[in-house]
Amino acid sequence: MPQNTLNTVILAAGKGTRMYSQMPKVLHCIGGKPMVERVIDTAAALNPQNICVVVGHGKEQVLDTVKRDAVWVEQTEQLGTGHAVKTALPHLASEGRTLVLYGDVPLIDVETLETLLEAAGNEVGLLTDVPADPAGLGRIIRDGSGSVTAIVEEKDASATQKTIREINTGILVLPNAKLENWLNSLSSNNAQGEYYLTDLIAKAVADGIKVRPVRVRASHLAAGVNNKRQLAELERIFQTEQAQELLKAGVTLRDPARFDLRGRLKHGQDVVIDVNVVIEGEVELGDNVEIGANCVIKNAKIGANSKIAPFSHLEGCEVGENNRIGPYARLRPQARLADDVHVGNFVEIKNAAIGKGTKANHLTYIGDAEVGSKTNFGAGTIIANYDGVHKHKTVIGDEVRIGSNCVLVAPVTLGNKVTTGAGSAITRNIEDNKLALARARQTVIEGWVRPEKNKQ
């Protein structure tokens, strides 16, 4: 096996007590993706021989949530980071190198890890930082020549050592040929009664192996999450970076600080996104698309020159070109809109194909339907697609005019150029060019006197 073989171990067994959550800490999300999933994806970009994830608390939840190709190893007792890596030993190559990462350090990037791996060579690589406040973190101990000799955890540090500002991020590169012996020789004789992975630095020095420190270029890249405040801080950093990338690519963000991207956005030119918009999953926006304030767009494709008015929610749908959607519109999964469609306020469309030029401007539900072109839905139109057990399909032709406050009871078919009178309940098929009325005749009662309250 070549000496440059890379194994990756991701430690994700911690409970996360300070998160005050029933969810395992590593499943809390940054940018809509669980932290541990982000770390796995970053590790995978390095093309390692394998990725080994050490889990413990909430193991079942983690395995059910994160669908990634990895070796999953359970740490039944949380006895420290050294013990966690030892748990993964049977899955690591006897030669090459092992990169140790953490499931709660979500913003570590490929560039930083490649720099660390290059610096480490076949020796030990150590990622360090000099944060504004090093409290609670392990300190880097150097000798008179500046070489790293040890890492001391804060609980075990002397008063002098606590004045050191350079800290250990926990991310290490270790030679596999030495790793097993080093791990087996670890002691838990320390303030926390745990097996510290950081003690391997002193063992490397004792064996004459050079420790190559690399300082991270930005503290947030190696920052861990221990509570909701830190989670929110990293989320905002992540979102700021996402917004800056979109701005560089030509997207207009009315306020970059009030925009969230929780997935991937593919976009054309001259796209404009107003404030408080959330993009989730896989979203594609064509040229000249405008997204109004307070919209949520999830797993959707929106064609060129379409405008999404404020407070609209689009999920799992496809919108053609030159559409006008909203305000307060909802497009649900499998809504498929052709070009030049208008969907107005308080209109909901689900699992329906809408033809070119069709309009539903207000207060309408269209579900499980196939609608032709240039059809108009009057206000208050409802497609009653559910009989309490099964969903049924409605077919509506071209240039149909549906009067206000109509109910179309599925399964039902309306031919081309059909007109329905306002207030009709349509339960039977209607042929082309027909007018259908299905409502009670109006009755006017002569001489009727409205009751009045007794004023006494």
From Swiss-Prot:
One of its GO terms (cellular component) is membrane. Its EC number is 2.7.7.23, 2.3.1.157. Coiled coil: none annotated. Residues 250-456 are annotated as: N-acetyltransferase. The active site is at residue 362. Residues 1-228 are annotated as: Pyrophosphorylase. Pathway: Nucleotide-sugar biosynthesis; UDP-N-acetyl-alpha-D-glucosamine biosynthesis; N-acetyl-alpha-D-glucosamine 1-phosphate from alpha-D-glucosamine 6-phosphate (route II): step 2/2; Nucleotide-sugar biosynthesis; UDP-N-acetyl-alpha-D-glucosamine biosynthesis; UDP-N-acetyl-alpha-D-glucosamine from N-acetyl-alpha-D-glucosamine 1-phosphate: step 1/1; Bacterial outer membrane biogenesis; LPS lipid A biosynthesis. UDP-N-acetyl-alpha-D-glucosamine binds at residues 11-14, 25, 75, 80-81, 102-104, 138, 153, 168, 226, 332, 350, 365, 376. It is found in: Cytoplasm. Mg(2+) binds at residues 104, 226. Binds 1 Mg(2+) ion per subunit. It comes from the Bacteria. Residues 229-249 are annotated as: Linker. InterPro entries: Bifunctional_GlmU (IPR005882), GlmU-like (IPR050065), GlmU_C_LbH (IPR038009), Hexapep (IPR001451), MobA-like_NTP_Trfase (IPR025877), Nucleotide-diphossugar_trans (IPR029044), Trimer_LpxA-like_sf (IPR011004). GO terms for molecular function: glucosamine-1-phosphate N-acetyltransferase activity; magnesium ion binding; UDP-N-acetylglucosamine diphosphorylase activity. One of its GO terms (biological process) is lipid A biosynthetic process. Acetyl-CoA binds at residues 379, 385-386, 404, 422, 439. Its cofactor is Mg(2+). CDD domains: GT2_GlmU_N_bac, LbH_GlmU_C. Keywords: Acyltransferase, Cell shape, Cell wall biogenesis/degradation, Cytoplasm, Magnesium, Metal-binding, Multifunctional enzyme, Nucleotidyltransferase, Peptidoglycan synthesis, Repeat, Transferase. It catalyses: alpha-D-glucosamine 1-phosphate + acetyl-CoA = N-acetyl-alpha-D-glucosamine 1-phosphate + CoA + H(+); N-acetyl-alpha-D-glucosamine 1-phosphate + UTP + H(+) = UDP-N-acetyl-alpha-D-glucosamine + diphosphate. Catalyzes the last two sequential reactions in the de novo biosynthetic pathway for UDP-N-acetylglucosamine (UDP-GlcNAc). The C-terminal domain catalyzes the transfer of acetyl group from acetyl coenzyme A to glucosamine-1-phosphate (GlcN-1-P) to produce N-acetylglucosamine-1-phosphate (GlcNAc-1-P), which is converted into UDP-GlcNAc by the transfer of uridine 5-monophosphate (from uridine 5-triphosphate), a reaction catalyzed by the N-terminal domain. In the N-terminal section; belongs to the N-acetylglucosamine-1-phosphate uridyltransferase family. Homotrimer. This is Bifunctional protein GlmU. The gene is glmU.
